[in-house]
């Protein structure tokens, strides 16, 4: 199943325009050492939606800070922590945060669609891993056979 079949997971593939992210960055930087939780959340959200890995990592870091320091904002952070980790390829972490959200909100369609994306990606990468291991085993067998054959002569 692709993300086009999962309208609620559209956030996974739709970055902000650079100018939109710059507005969030400017507000975050303007507030400096006294940045508000909402400003920090907004900036982290924009970073996670980015196509750039460094931005996504920074977004996850900022949301993790909010998650730890502001228990009243944890529910809001869960989806975007799951999404950020998904985009970074940290599927175990993505699943953990997403499952926490689903436990709190079993009817959350956004979290349900993200669960499907995570499961699909894990399956796909698992198959690629199996193919790589199989290819390596085949290559080792061929090399071993050639070496064995060479020793018999």
Curated annotation (Swiss-Prot):
Has a role in mitochondrial fission. Has a role in outer membrane fission but not matrix separation. Signal peptide: none annotated. It is a single-pass membrane protein. Belongs to the FIS1 family. PANTHER family: MITOCHONDRIAL FISSION 1 PROTEIN, TETRATRICOPEPTIDE REPEAT PROTEIN 11 TPR REPEAT PROTEIN 11. Keywords: Membrane, Mitochondrion, Mitochondrion outer membrane, Repeat, TPR repeat, Transmembrane, Transmembrane helix. It comes from Emericella nidulans (strain FGSC A4 / ATCC 38163 / CBS 112.46 / NRRL 194 / M139). It is found in: Mitochondrion outer membrane. CDD domains: Fis1 (cd12212). The keyword Thylakoid does not apply. GO terms for molecular function: lipid binding; molecular adaptor activity. TPR repeats lie at residues 75-108. This is Mitochondrial fission 1 protein. Residues 149-153 are mitochondrial intermembrane. Residues 1-127 are cytoplasmic. One of its GO terms (biological process) is mitochondrial fission. The C-terminus is required for mitochondrial localization, while the N-terminus is necessary for mitochondrial fission. The gene is fis1. The chain crosses the membrane at residues 128-148. Its main location: mitochondrion. GO terms for cellular component: mitochondrial outer membrane; peroxisomal membrane.
């Amino acid at each position: 199943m692709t993300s086009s079949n999962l309208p609620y997971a559209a956030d996974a593939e739709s970055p902000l325009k650079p100018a939109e992210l710059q507005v969030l960055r400017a507000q975050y930087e303007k507030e400096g050492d006294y940045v508000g939780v909402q400003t920090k959340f907004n900036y982290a959200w924009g970073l996670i939606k980015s196509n750039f890995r460094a931005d996504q990592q920074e977004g996850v870091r900022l949301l993790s800070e909010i998650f730890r320091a502001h228990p009243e904002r944890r529910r809001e952070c869960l989806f975007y922590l799951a999404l950020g980790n998904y985009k970074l390829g940290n599927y175990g972490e993505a699943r953990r945060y997403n499952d926490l959200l689903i436990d709190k909100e079993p009817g959350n369609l956004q979290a349900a669609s993200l669960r499907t994306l995570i499961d699909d990606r894990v399956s796909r990468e698992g198959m690629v891993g199996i193919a790589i291991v199989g290819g390596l085993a085949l290559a080792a067998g061929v090399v071993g056979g050639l070496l064995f054959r060479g020793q018999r002569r």
